[in-house]
């Protein structure tokens, strides 16, 4: 039987865990309450750059030493940066807990940010930016976000820009680390065959030297959304389209309705958009709907990739499906089938210790209630057909922002999209 526990240490650090004694693995994450939205204009991409630098050595371990240490543990080691948090995580066999945690702690507390390592890693991140820009089905989301939220930090790319990343020096890293990498801004989340009391004891030992503090509370700016057509002309084989509208912020009480609506429209192979645009007409390979909720702001969008000559027809079909669902064309069977899908995927995902760890760490870092899977499935099953229809009408009435990367000019696209 699994058990969830939480402890706040004297230095402000939070330790939260879910014990699953029926497995041998442990997934452990160090979650820092800092993301790209917390950067000043002169720090664009610095949060993500710092994530890279944490792997580049401490006074006692070089980057190869760190990699070899986790290899010897038979462990997975990685990290990621989002708009609202940064996470360093490892997955390992349960008897390697102290060996893994001690080095993770050393990485985030004692990284030395040598100028040689910074010079090399700047080039690595610039290559990462180039890879993203060369992937139009990825980069079209950046175009959409930057155009839809032009004066909001959630509209800016997590990776930053070449110019800013190319300018970072030792002092920038030291100052950013001192400002954000303190105990009050850190949640240690673990799931698997782990004892909570042992985890707390180890956290006290290995994070004793970390600067204490209180959790940072970010100032939430009022979002100003822009609508219209935003395009980038490229010599490519497909038109990559994102059609989006302002949406619910993180933790909104209507989030269960929103997920059901999104799934009906474009969340599976039986969804409206997949069936109508791909299966019946063969106009796309990839089409789906998604939502992104952040503190104080949210976005909802549809992505489609199609032959440029099909752009107008795909846009027509997207609007047609939005209109249909808003006009009461949802059966009780379709509603229940999609709710079953959501609940089933939720429960299947929680068989992984990593999924449990991410769930714990993300919700604690963002100040969300630690709801149980049972509470979530109950929330989805309480959604009614009328609630879905009402939300669909709101979605349809919102002014969209449409981002397109294609061989067409802005003028040509305007005729196709709005003509």
Regions found by a protein language model. Name each.
Residues 22, 27-91, 264-283, 294:
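M16/MPP (pitrilysin/insulinase) zinc-metallopeptidase core fold and M16-derived inactive scaffolds
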Residues 228:
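Flexible, small-/acidic-enriched active-site or ligand-binding loops
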